[in-house]
């Protein structure tokens, strides 16, 4: 049993700690799968971008592909502008329109606007709201490098089953089963976009 302290944010038992640590790893994997997952991979699901790095195209999706050049500080604003230029005018003013980028792109963007002296971004005080040309930025952990998605957040769906018997996470002490000093973790859940 771990003792309480003012700055102790660990779980009181080892089992609870192990489950919380595993849940964080699972959450990171799900965040990655939301954007980059492929249905062909065992234990994964088809993400928004999938293996090709672009949405499945239909008449309502404009895939703007970077010409193979990685994003750097000097071209990040041009790439963001190129992505916004493909947004139809009927969508551009929508309140829930977001530009989804990863932390590399966000860091490059902040660095570039800081260099240009935009709204004192080099200071990054609490007044700054991340926007680009009037569109709010949504920084996403799981998104791959050199990708930009501009979409209404109401058009991106993530689903999971939280209430069934098929959703669980628990530890399994192997000492009673095979005499070993091992602990296994069982995690069952379903998710998809």
List the predicted regions and their residue ranges:
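Ordered core of a single globular domain
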Residues: 78-113
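Alpha-helical scaffold segments that mediate packing/assembly in large oligomeric complexes
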Residues: 2-85
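Short coil/turn segments at secondary-structure boundaries
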Residues: 34-39, 94-102, 122-124
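Sequence/fold signature of self-assembling virion shell proteins
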Residues: 49-78, 98, 110-193
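Short, surface-exposed loop and linker segments with low hydrophobicity and enrichment for Pro/Ser/Thr
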Residues: 6-12, 85-92, 141-144, 149, ...
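Short secondary-structure junctions and interdomain/linker hinges
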Residues: 25, 29, 33, 87-95, ...
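Internal mixed-charge
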Residues: 27, 31, 103, 139
């Amino acid at each position: 049993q771990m003792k309480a302290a003012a700055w102790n944010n660990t779980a009181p038992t080892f089992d609870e700690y192990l489950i919380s640590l595993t849940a964080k790893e699972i959450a990171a994997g799900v965040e990655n799968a939301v954007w980059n997952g492929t249905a062909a991979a065992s234990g994964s699901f088809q993400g928004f971008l999938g293996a090709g790095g672009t949405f499945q195209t239909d008449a309502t999706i404009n895939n703007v592909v970077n010409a193979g050049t990685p994003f750097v500080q000097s071209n990040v604003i041009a790439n963001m502008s190129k992505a916004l230029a493909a947004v139809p005018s009927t969508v551009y003013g929508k309140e829930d329109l977001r530009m989804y980028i990863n932390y590399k792109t966000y860091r490059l963007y902040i660095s570039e606007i800081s260099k240009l002296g935009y709204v004192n971004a080099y200071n990054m005080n609490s007044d700054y709201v991340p926007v680009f040309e009037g569109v709010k930025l949504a920084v996403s952990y799981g998104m791959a490098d050199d990708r930009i998605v501009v979409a209404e957040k109401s058009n991106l769906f993530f689903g999971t089953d939280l209430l069934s018997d098929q959703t669980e996470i628990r530890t399994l002490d192997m000492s009673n089963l095979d005499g070993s000093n091992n602990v296994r973790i069982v995690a069952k859940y379903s998710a998809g976009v």
